[in-house]
UniProtKB/Swiss-Prot annotation:
Glycans are attached at residues 116, 314, 389, 473. Residues 1-22 have a biased composition (Basic and acidic residues). It comes from Homo sapiens. This is Protein FAM234A. It is found in: Membrane. Belongs to the FAM234 family. Pfam families: Beta-prop_FAM234A_B. Residues 1-49 are cytoplasmic. GO terms for cellular component: cell surface; extracellular exosome; membrane. The gene is FAM234A. PANTHER family: PROTEIN FAM234A, PTHR21419.
Length: 552
């Protein structure tokens, strides 16, 4: 049993605590001993608190300095719209973008022919040894359209390729290569316009220069990809190999042994062999880069051949099995699981070929394909191809799944002959926004009957499959068009090059930029079939909220 003291402590615990505290007060020596024997926890706590507040003060001080004392770099103000005009000029079907002045906004490069340059630059055709008029290359700011550099580059230009890498340590990390007429071959610094090298070309005066300019792996060991120019003379295609860093010819001219057309594609098989693919009538022709290199240099090189491909190529005609209905018009690379596949577009149908076996993966039926397809994403993170099937008032836009060839969507979009190519931009929802040109009044043929050429630019997004947004309409002749992401997630715009349809009749040439989002509020909503419950303004709001992103 509990004694009297324990029982009282259990019944009255507070009194017991008071008694203990009074005992401690009455015995100070014992209390001091307890303090001396206790660990210095209170002093450690005070040190921790001081360190915490000191760290907090330092963090706040750094935030204050970064936010208010150190000035932030000025972000250039990007105009919503700008326009540059050249009188008595001719514009080329060439358009390229790159950040030339380092302001993190894409700038625009183009070519035009004129007697003199713009008022800001005094270099004339005569200064560069050309007769007037001659071809000028120009780079303008994507932010405001101001001229960054401009100079005469050739009497006339047959072929141009920009963003060609240069060797490490060179004065320019990237160059524009121009093949001129009658016999010039020049490289200019992409960022300043200054000449890197300039030579006379070795092409015959009767030779036609075929597109595009191909970049092949470095064979002369200078650290830059080398250049392959293909020409056609007397129904025979020949290859000319040049150093990418100096422009000097490597070896002699080499014949591919077959007739061909523009639209060449440099393809790498899954064994690492390089082949040149090109359309020849209704067949697909090919040539080994290894064999061409041995012809032009007389010696072996760093390239190799693929035995399977050599067995598919006819030794005499260099033709492969025809997979096309009608003339082959375009060859395009498509990303595959184990390398690139080849999309072969014919005038009456198209087919996706396996990149190694060249066997059809799928073959949808299409009646009349005359335009180059574009790629984009109809479903999230799933690559699709948009094909223009038919022309004029019968044109349809087909969206096909690149994995299966299944038709995802079909849009009836009548167009005018000779309309600009389509374009696409990736959006933040892992799809793409598509831009197509068509008739201003989709349900009327009066424009084609009266000859009133009025192109309208339509915007389409897969989340609204029964709606088109008419952004703008243009009555002048459009030479080139592209949709460009000038700043990541901020600034999507389209670029137009307009000018005379006849290159022999100079006239007004214009370079125009319009920001897409600023055109949406005044756009016209076009409903295809029965529209949904959303109002026109609600649809415009959805297009305005689209965010764009760079390609992965």
């Amino acid at each position: 049993m509990l004694d009297h003291k324990d029982l009282e402590a259990e019944i009255h615990p507070l009194k017991n605590e008071e008694r203990k505290s009074q005992e401690n007060l009455g015995n100070p020596s014992k209390n001091e001993d307890n303090v001396k024997s206790a660990p210095p926890q209170s002093r450690l706590s005070r040190c921790r608190a001081a360190a915490f507040f000191l760290s907090l003060f330092l963090c706040l001080f750094v935030v204050f300095v970064v936010s208010f004392v150190i000035p932030c770099p000025d972000r250039p103000a990007s105009q919503r719209m700008w326009r540059i005009d050249y009188s008595a000029a001719v514009i080329y079907d060439f358009l390229a973008v790159d950040d030339i002045n380092g302001d993190r906004i894409q700038d625009v490069l183009f070519l035009y022919k004129n007697t003199n340059s713009s008022n800001n630059f005094s270099r004339s055709c005569v200064d560069e040894g050309f007769s007037s008029p001659c071809t000028f290359a120009a780079a303008v700011s994507g932010a405001n359209g101001s001229t960054l550099w401009e100079r005469p580059v050739a009497q006339d230009v047959a072929l141009v390729e920009c963003a060609v890498p240069q060797p490490r340590g060179s004065e320019a990390p990237s160059a524009c290569i121009l093949v001129g007429r009658p016999s010039s071959f020049i490289a200019v610094n992409l960022f300043t316009g200054e000449t890197l090298w300039n030579h006379s070309s070795s092409f015959s005066g009767n030779a036609s220069i075929l597109s595009p300019l191909l970049q092949v792996p470095d064979v002369d060991g200078d650290g830059a990809p080398d250049l392959l120019v293909l020409t056609q003379e007397r129904e025979e295609v020949s290859g000319h190999l040049y150093s990418g860093s100096t422009g000097h010819q490597i070896g002699l001219r080499g014949s591919l042994g077959v007739d061909g057309e523009s639209g060449f594609l440099l393809h790498v098989t899954r064994t690492g062999a390089h082949y040149i693919l090109f359309p020849c009538a209704s067949s697909l022709c090919g040539c080994s880069v290894k064999g061409l290199y041995e012809k032009v240099t007389g010696s072996g090189g760093p390239f190799k051949s693929d035995p399977h491909w050599e067995s598919m190529l006819n030794a005499t005609t260099r033709r492969m099995l025809s997979h096309s209905s009608g003339a082959v018009r375009y060859l395009m690379h498509v990303p595959g699981n184990a390398g690139a596949d080849v999309l072969l577009v014919g005038s009456e149908a198209f087919v996706l070929l396996d990149g190694q076996e060249l066997t059809p993966r799928w073959t949808p039926k299409a009646a009349h394909v005359l335009r180059k397809p574009i790629f984009g994403r109809y479903k999230p993170d799933t690559l699709a191809v948009a094909v223009e099937n038919g022309t004029g008032t019968d044109r349809q836009i087909l969206f096909l799944d690149l994995g299966t060839g299944a038709v995802l969507c079909s849009l009836a979009l009548p167009s005018l002959p000779g309309g600009p190519l389509s374009a696409s931009l990736p959006t933040a929802d892992h799809r793409s926004a598509f831009f197509f040109w068509g008739l201003h009044e989709l349900g009327s043929t009066s424009e084609t009957e009266t000859g009133e050429a009025r192109h309208s630019l339509y915007m389409f997004h897969p989340t609204l499959p029964r709606v088109l947004l008419e952004l703008a309409n243009v009555s002048t002749h459009i030479v080139a068009f592209d949709a460009v992401l000038f700043e990541p997630s901020r600034h999507a715009a389209y670029i137009l090059l307009t000018g005379p349809a006849d290159s022999e009749a100079p006239g007004l040439v214009s370079v125009i930029k319009h920001k897409v989002r600023d055109l949406v509020p005044s756009s016209r909503v076009v409903r295809l079939g029965e529209g949904g419950p959303d109002s026109d303004q609600a649809i415009r709001d959805r297009f305005s909220r689209l965010r764009y992103q760079s390609e992965a």
